[in-house]
């Protein structure tokens, strides 16, 4: 086989412009079927959900070689791209030469033709990219990342890397993982008997970040608009289909945006991502719609159709109380001051308004210290974007720009000033109105793929008792 | 001041198309000078290195307000964009209204007009984005990230997220940070008295990854081509201008690429990034050239000019031995089997070839277990891209695709098979020739910015005894 012949990606070959030409296709065997005269091999190379049909005339190929071509094997094929006579594909490759790169013993290869449960595939996360489902999901994941970078780049916002290892634990977003190089069998101790973190790698106690927001704000107060896109961590012992210990987050932070501008940005942003998916991933989305979630495409179009409803928390509570009065049953009680549960959010979105909702002006007690206090002294300019099926997809706020108010709120919430001296500096010197929000990347992917378990939209999920691979 | 008037970014206003129009500019004061009749304010909003000159006729503004406009203050200005009479700028804004968002007390604001050392600025990493130098660096950092995504996206390679928290420590790339939720004051113990990591969050001992390569290969063996772009960690106690404990790495991994293809990819990739910088960041690069590194632009063009020299390690050693014979002095000894030091790499690039060098076919003893063994049984298909000033900028290899050879090499290098069962599966089932490499993002930035300390090209550097902010 001619090693120097350029490889053609199956996605490109399927477009049909190369019909009549000799091409070189490489990929993994999905299925092989046929009769005594001819074999049909469905080959996939990851460039598309669609396989290329390889037609091998058995008169031209060694039977021993052909018998090695089983599901999961990797082969290279040279042949002529022709219009297909069969149903199910428009073009196929009439093979003139086949090279086997790697076999896959049918007796042990875990991914045979038959369907597998998602649970089983999680146990072989190193092989699941070879399935149709996960090829689809990882391609969509890629496209959503590119959409995000493109959106912000076009706005003139800069991609900014917040640190992962942090000595700060004031964000209040959740439990943290400790990062250390101390030997647990010979921990250094202070005179008082405490672990002496001055001897640790960073000379202090350090953890994995739960958010890059505070550092991102420092950059926004100089560069104008920035966004982070990086991993964040939560050490909560939450074994649910919605929680990961390690996940990716996008956090734009923009100077001179007030809460209304922030809502505009969030709505434009998420619609841009969904539109990108429909424009660029339709083959993959159709596969998921067919196999997992018949309503997926309708749900994606649903969020594009109308402006999101903008709703103050207080009004939202009134609607939910009204619903309860009219006989709607919720698991969790609803009252002014309560943190909304997913059931409440979904009621507002799916039943009451039938459109995504941006809820604002939450009671200050249930939100973080850095959110801008409203004139009523009771509510803050937080905003959550609520979506069908998944509830909260974005959380953000206008930030408190006033130094004195910020210090007062930090004190109220028990955040020590000495831990946020640098954050306070941004309000001490040249403060400006600014806003931002966070989007959990995997939450977005749950929405765009229609998958129901977050472990299926990240390549190697980290959850309690699970860090394999 | 009209709150609803749309803000114009200074980068856009400076293009001049808006001359004669009333615009709204917001940003931070770099300097203010003037006389009794008029003040000139240099305003920067992060959209460009260039400031907008604001002209304030003192007859129209309150003296008390004007006195608050000092270096570091944040203001909004409405005024008419006019062609400038003064030298140094083509347009300026004749202010009709000024709003002060935040003052910056000259008695305490750390960034006064005078120059600051880079060492001092590292201590106020939360404020250094407000300097010209770091505005420039973070904009270039953004552009290089966008260049990287664009390059791979255009090739049809997928952005793939390898896990950060890992139970695997077989890559051999360096010391690792432990990740734990165990309470050091009440560590669970096994019957044998060891720390019982089964009680830790993930049910086992976990660390921060040193590379996403092995997981990336799993994806390449299904999706064809992927790249990672994420943080990686090294716990080495290296307090040098070239080392970080937390840094970002780009690791493409591509099926069906052999070593020559891999060299082509690396060369095309890095030239693409450098060309992008010259095309999109010239104002910022010119600033760095003027203030830090007069040879910067020449060095950037240098790598674009010629094909990189491709040189086998054995031949490289011969050249270096010849140089020693001719009187060249190196600090470290040179002999076949030695790991090259930066001085050797730079000699080859800067003195001998006067072009970047891709060195290949290293002795297997000094490279990782996963590199493809050559037929000589002594060398492996590793490749390092060597650059002027910084030495190695990329390290990669063709990967060992043969199951038996890979197992043998793992055993030789002391990598336990039980720890890489999943990695070996990729060679057990449908293996394929494939290659990849790693580029340290901050190494690229050192090259593109000409900065000499790696702590100055990442927003919040993490190094021994340093995790502030």
From Swiss-Prot, chains A, B:
Signal peptide: none annotated. Its EC number is 6.1.1.22. It catalyses: tRNA(Asn) + L-asparagine + ATP = L-asparaginyl-tRNA(Asn) + AMP + diphosphate + H(+). InterPro entries: Aa-tRNA-synt_II, aa-tRNA-synth_II, aa-tRNA-synth_II/BPL/LPL, Asn-tRNA-ligase, Asp/Asn-tRNA-synth_IIb, NA-bd_OB-fold, NA-bd_OB_tRNA. Gene3D superfamilies: Bira Bifunctional Protein, Domain 2, Nucleic acid-binding proteins. GO terms for cellular component: cytoplasm. GO terms for molecular function: asparagine-tRNA ligase activity; ATP binding; nucleic acid binding. Keywords: Aminoacyl-tRNA synthetase, ATP-binding, Cytoplasm, Ligase, Nucleotide-binding, Protein biosynthesis. Pfam families: tRNA-synt_2, tRNA_anti-codon. GO terms for biological process: asparaginyl-tRNA aminoacylation. The keyword ATP-binding applies. It is found in: Cytoplasm. The keyword Zinc does not apply. It is an enzyme of class 6 (ligase). Its main location: cytoplasm. Belongs to the class-II aminoacyl-tRNA synthetase family. Homodimer. This is Asparagine--tRNA ligase. It comes from Porphyromonas gingivalis (strain ATCC 33277 / DSM 20709 / CIP 103683 / JCM 12257 / NCTC 11834 / 2561).
